[in-house]
């Protein structure tokens, strides 16, 4: 599952992969597309605009046309709340 959220003015995409939550910037590094509108398969998110893919756990760009990694954020669950480190 993928969910777009805004935290302290920053647009993020949250992903559930094998019971863990991961977070990246919501904007693709290649084009103006929201990753939260993309297709998640395993730990890879496919950009809905040009079909480039990223590893949501590491942010690594996996295939053309994306060449720049996407920023990831540390996530932890506390008292059933998702806590994201924006630093």
Swiss-Prot record:
Q: Which residues bind [2Fe-2S] cluster?
A: 28, 30, 47, 50
Give one GO term, molecular function aspect: metal ion binding
Q: Which residues form a coiled coil?
A: none
| Pathway note | Aromatic compound metabolism; naphthalene degradation
Matching entries from Pfam families are given as: Rieske
- InterPro entries, from UniProt? Rieske_2Fe-2S, Rieske_2Fe-2S_sf
Q: Cofactor binding mode, per the note? A: Binds 1 [2Fe-2S] cluster per subunit.
> In what residue span(s) does the Rieske domain sit?
1-84
**The protein's required cofactors:** [2Fe-2S] cluster
Q: Which GO terms describe its biological process?
A: catabolic process
Q: Which UniProt keywords apply?
A: 2Fe-2S, Aromatic hydrocarbons catabolism, Electron transport, Iron, Iron-sulfur, Metal-binding, Plasmid, Transport
Assembly and interaction partners:
The naphthalene dioxygenase (NDO) multicomponent enzyme system is composed of an electron transfer component and a dioxygenase component (iron sulfur protein (ISP)). The electron transfer component is composed of a ferredoxin reductase (NdoR) and a ferredoxin (NdoA), and the dioxygenase component is formed of a heterohexamer (trimer of heterodimers) of three large alpha subunits (NdoB) and three small beta subunits (NdoC).
Q: What does this protein do?
A: Component of the naphthalene dioxygenase (NDO) multicomponent enzyme system which catalyzes the incorporation of both atoms of molecular oxygen into naphthalene to form cis-(1R,2S)-dihydroxy-1,2-dihydronaphthalene. Functions as an intermediate electron transfer protein via a specific interaction with iron sulfur protein components (ISP) (NdoB and NdoC).
Regarding protein family, the annotation reads: Belongs to the bacterial ring-hydroxylating dioxygenase ferredoxin component family.
Write down what this protein is called: Naphthalene 1,2-dioxygenase system, ferredoxin component
Native source species = Pseudomonas fluorescens
Q: Which gene encodes it?
A: ndoA
């Amino acid at each position: 599952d993928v969910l777009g959220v805004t935290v302290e003015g920053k647009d993020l995409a949250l992903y559930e992969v094998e019971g863990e939550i991961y977070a990246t910037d919501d904007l693709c590094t290649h084009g103006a597309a929201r990753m939260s509108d993309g297709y998640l398969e395993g730990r890879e998110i496919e950009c809905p605009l040009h079909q480039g893919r990223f590893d949501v756990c590491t942010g690594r760009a996996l295939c053309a046309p994306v060449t720049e990694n996407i920023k990831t954020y540390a996530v932890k669950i506390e008292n059933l709340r998702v806590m994201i480190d924006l630093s």
